[in-house]
Structures are given as structure tokens and as C-alpha cells.
């Protein structure tokens, strides 16, 4: 009996399923495991201060041998504990911001869901073309924030940033769920201009929102994508340590220094995305 032209042979189906199952299984040496943990420490720290830790951990996972999508998915999951650790480290600066969290968190969560789905169904080039432009705009907002604050001082600004910030956080959540590098730069730029608040308190709020973006996207990835659980574990260990270190260092930076760090990280993000 001949095979139906619309159905793959059983052995081809089995091979496809086996290949998909093994995508997340890569033989990792002890040295490579240490490198992944150290990358997690650095990423957890830089994510707490500003963001873009993915620019370190994603290439490391690729270098170890994980396929791009598996590396991206596992990276998102592995950095969740570090994001939560960093948010906890900044809990003092979160005091009095419960209203903002309640208003903006749904935007981040919805964006993360959309972004995670886009990662699975769309080619990378369809989304990444605009990413450098978004980061560049965010950097301009961060640098111009003091000047803009003076110009807007006489205008009434919404305590929670208004509709414009909600939409901006939603769009940043989409990007964060899809890839995530420099997500923090985008959120910091938006909140710094649309809210009249000290940059350290803005950073604390950013840590909460980006942590939930990673968490929601990560949970979805468990069900709709391949996950390399060893990589997740190694990154989680490192990122928790890095998150606490980042909180201690970040809150000691004066506003001008923190803006300088944001600009440097943002420029590196643009360069790496354009050249990869």
C-alpha cells in the first residue's frame, strides 16, 4: 500500500520528533558550565542596573552549542530568578509605587505573551529590523531626561505615566518576550520621561516589570518551545547572585553615572544586534 502524499512516513515523523526532543540536549563540559554560570552572574547584575544581560548569556549559550531558538528560550527562563533577585534588592526604592506596579504590570504581562508567541511563529528578521531603532530612541530619551524634565516641569504629568506609558510598556513587553536584550533600556527611557521620578526609583520599577516579562514568557516557552534545562539551571544559579550584586552596586550610582551605563549598554546592544 502506498503512502499518502499528504502524510510523512512513520520513520520520518519519528526522526523529526527525536530531533526536536534532542535540540535542548547538548553535552556541556565542566569548564563550559562554569562559563555559563559566570555569564549568568554578569547578566543578573547588569539586568538589575539597567538591562541587556541577554547580550552576554545568549551568545555564550550559542557558543556552547545550543540552537538559536533553544538558547533564547532557555536564556529567558534562566534569567528569571536573577530578575526577581534584583527586584527584591531594590525593594526599598519600590516603596510607595504599588499603584504604578498595579497599573503597568498588566501591560508587561500582555506584551510578554504576544512576544513569546511571535518568537515561535515569526522569523527573527521580521522583528529584529526595528530593534536598533527602538533602542536608539530609548537612549535619546534617557540622555535627554533631565532637559525634558525641566521643560515639562510646568506641565502636569500623570503619576503613573498615563496611557502613553502603558502602551509603551506593552510594546516593550512584546520585545522582551521575543528577545529581551536592552528591554530595560527601553522601559527606563519611557518611564524617565513620562513620569516625574528619581532615576533610581524608576530603575526599581523597571526591575519588577522586566522580571515579570521574563517570567511570563518563560512559562509559556515551557509549553510551546524546546528548553535546555541544564542551561536554565546554570544561568539561574549565576543570575541570582548577580541580581543581588547588581542591586548593591546600582543603587550607589549617581543619576549621571547610571545614565552613562545605560548609554554604553544600549550602544553595545545596537552594535551587536546589527552585526549578528
Show where each model-derived region lies.
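N-terminal amphipathic/basic-hydrophobic helices that include classical n-h-c signal peptides
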Residues: 1-27
Amino acid at each position: 500500500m502506498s503512502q499518502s502524499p499528504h502524510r510523512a512516513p512513520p520513520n520520518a515523523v519519528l526522526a523529526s520528533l527525536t530531533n526536536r526532543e534532542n535540540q535542548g540536549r547538548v553535552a556541556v563540559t565542566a569548564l563550559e558550565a562554569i562559563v555559563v554560570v559566570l555569564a549568568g552572574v554578569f547578566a543578573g547584575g547588569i539586568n538589575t542596573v539597567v538591562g541587556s544581560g541577554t547580550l552576554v548569556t545568549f551568545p555564550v549559550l550559542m557558543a556552547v552549542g545550543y540552537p538559536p531558538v533553544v538558547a533564547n528560550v532557555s536564556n529567558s527562563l534562566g534569567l528569571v530568578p536573577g530578575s526577581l533577585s534584583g527586584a527584591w534588592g531594590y525593594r526599598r526604592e519600590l516603596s510607595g509605587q504599588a499603584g504604578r506596579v498595579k497599573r503597568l504590570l498588566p501591560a508587561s504581562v500582555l506584551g510578554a505573551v504576544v512576544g513569546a508567541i511571535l518568537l515561535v511563529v515569526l522569523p527573527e528578521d521580521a522583528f529584529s529590523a526595528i530593534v536598533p531603532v527602538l533602542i536608539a530612541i530609548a537612549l535619546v530619551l534617557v540622555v535627554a531626561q533631565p532637559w525634558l524634565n525641566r521643560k515639562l516641569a510646568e506641565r502636569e504629568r500623570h503619576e503613573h505615566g498615563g496611557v502613553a506609558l502603558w502602551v509603551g510598556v506593552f510594546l516593550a513587553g512584546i520585545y522582551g518576550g521575543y528577545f529581551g536584550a536592552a528591554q530595560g533600556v527601553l522601559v527606563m527611557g519611557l518611564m524617565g520621561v513620562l513620569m516625574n521620578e528619581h532615576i533610581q526609583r524608576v530603575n526599581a520599577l523597571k526591575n519588577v516589570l522586566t522580571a515579570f516579562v521574563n517570567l511570563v514568557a518563560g512559562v509559556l516557552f515551557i509549553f510551546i518551545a524546546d528548553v535546555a534545562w541544564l542551561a536554565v539551571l546554570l544561568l539561574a544559579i549565576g543570575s541570582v547572585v548577580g541580581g543581588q550584586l547588581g542591586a548593591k552596586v546600582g543603587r550607589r550610582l549617581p543619576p549621571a553615572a547610571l545614565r552613562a551605563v545605560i548609554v554604553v549598554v544600549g550602544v553595545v546592544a545596537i552594535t551587536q544586534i546589527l552585526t549578528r
